[in-house]
Amino acid sequence: MDELLAGLVNQKIKDFEVVIVEDGSQNPCKDVVERYKDRLDICYLWKENGGPSAARNMGVEACHGEYVLILDSDCVIPEGYLTAVEAELDREPCNAFGGPDRANAAFTPLQKAVNYTMTSFFTTGGIRGGKKKLDKFYPRSFNMGMQTSVYKQLGGFSDMRFGEDIDLSYRVFENGYSCRLFPDAWVWHKRRTDFRKFFRQVVNSGIARINLTKRHPGTLKLVHMLPAAFTLGVIVLLLASLFWVYALIPLLFYALLIFCGATIQEKSLLVGVLAIPAAFVQLGGYGLGFLWAWWRRCIMREGEFGAFKKNFYK
């Protein structure tokens, strides 16, 4: 939170307000917010833990501006962020928008590796704001903007526990509002600090994809099914390798592709090495969550659900 607020202080544009909503956190940031009250027009709100949707909706109700920007507390904002947002709105106004995320040079090698896998075309198909993409861009809540009036007309974030940002983005398009990517309005986004937390995150992302498909029929694309196909393919190849060692060649080739891409982008052999397990955790976790939710929701006809509920928000 300290880094997020410090980044907002350094913005060249100063005409904005900041609303911080504490969602029952075990590590309150009120003292941090107090340190910035003489440098930012800032409001601190606290509520019982109820998940990010309710917290964001509460925050927007307290806002007074024409546009509202949604940022995660683990983001760091570059100096030109608001300038880039304003320039894009002046050039081509729209009702909603979002920007990409990047890794900061100060991030740990693991965070850089996870950032690579979360943004690379070879692992996401470019749907998180990359220049190459297999599906249209949908803003995500770590870096999302919207006209306040549109946000309220849409009812804000839904009660989905995971995937609530994509749900809101879908409703933007379904209701005929304009939405686009602001490529220069990027943020530094801190990633999970260990593979266990990362696995939990991506499993829920896979589950959320099926939940989103149920809420918004017709939104499931080929790119969303690729991690599940990858997961099944890995299982088949590993089993086949017990009888034919050359079955491992496709996996080794993919690992080499990830290693080279991450090493070149981050200029670090260590990041390249860490990106290999990060990619397999990401695709495998998402694929398992996707398949699990497909079985429970599409075959067994159960309702919405999520995994690791007790720990995700702590």
Feature annotation, model-predicted:
Residues 99-105, 114-137, 152, 215:
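Short, flexible, basic/aromatic active-site loop/helix in glycosyltransferases
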Residues 47-63, 84, 134, 138-142:
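Glycine-rich, basic loop-to-helix element that forms the pyrophosphate-binding segment
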Residues 158-220:
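Catalytic donor/gating beta->alpha subdomain of glycosyltransferases that bind UDP-sugars
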Residues 230-300:
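Membrane-embedded multi-pass helical conduit in multi-pass membrane proteins
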Residues 5-46:
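Acidic donor-binding segment of Leloir-type glycosyltransferases
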Residues 68:
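Short aromatic/hydrophobic "clamp" motif used to bind/position activated sugar donors
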Residues 79-112, 116, 185-186, 190:
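Conserved donor NDP-sugar-binding/catalytic core segment of glycosyltransferases
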Residues 27-28, 75-88, 170:
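Acidic donor-binding/catalytic loop of UDP-sugar-dependent glycosyltransferases
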